[in-house]
Amino acid sequence: MLAGLAATHPEARFRFCYRAHRYLRSWRATLPRNARRSLLAEPLGPRGADLFHGLNQRLPRIALPRSIATIHDLFVMTSEYSTPEFRARFTEQARDAASRATAIIAVSEFTRQQVIAHLGAAPGRVHVVHHGIRALPRADRPREPVILNVGAIQKRKNIARLVEAFETVNADWRLVLAGSAGYGSEEILARIARSPAGSRISVLGYISAEDLAGWYGRCSVFAFPSLDEGFGMPVLEAMAAGAPVLTSNRSALPEVAGDAALLVDPESPEELGKALRDLTKSEDLRRDLAGRGSLRAQLFTWENAVRATWDVYRQVLG
């Protein structure tokens, strides 16, 4: 999105600031002529900018004339899905950003309401800008009897209940989990190891974008029963790839999925299992959801995100 902002507004000058652990990787990307990159070394910078936009809940600890913070989610504050140390650090950063930022961008209306409720931000300062979908290579191939889940192996992603629900699905089907190990993964992997359906469950770990596109293209069902999401990008990626989607009826997921997915109570293995069985048994249901999902995904573009972000910039700059 940053390059898109610079490319669509050649009249403005942009400086993309990276903390040390991201600076070297940033050189892989080519920037528009009106943008340059620099190392963000607090407390020396950034200085001299009319507006600073921080892309997460952490603003530099220096005086900024005008600033925007993007907040993606607050589950670290509101739930026990991370270590106490990380929760304390995140909470301090989010509260600091909410108190100092001229405006806040939330990636969903759900996150906007959380920012207002938990960080005390005035409603007029918090703007919703939905993400666009990243461009993944299209993998056109025959669908297989595979249920795919994409995301970290962690408690928040509700993998243990997904495994329990999968155990009720016809034995012709496989469950494929694509994502790195996260908080609470040991318990989840132990649950998979003792599952009676364990031989039909594949844990891939982290996979490349190319491999991910391949699995989106191969799966016949995409299941994402997460307990808490500030947005839910995998839902839209699966829809864009033509996969029928099952997801949770809470957090930002209904906002993102609309009427193009089966929505279930993620804390009910029975409801989740029934939805999986319905999807695996009915090709008509899968076809209907795939068609609606493809149309839904087209609403979330980076062009829209760039326009909405620039509108917030204009408001802040007056």
Predicted regions and their residues:
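Carbohydrate transferase catalytic cores enriched for Leloir-type hexosyltransferases
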Residues: 1-318
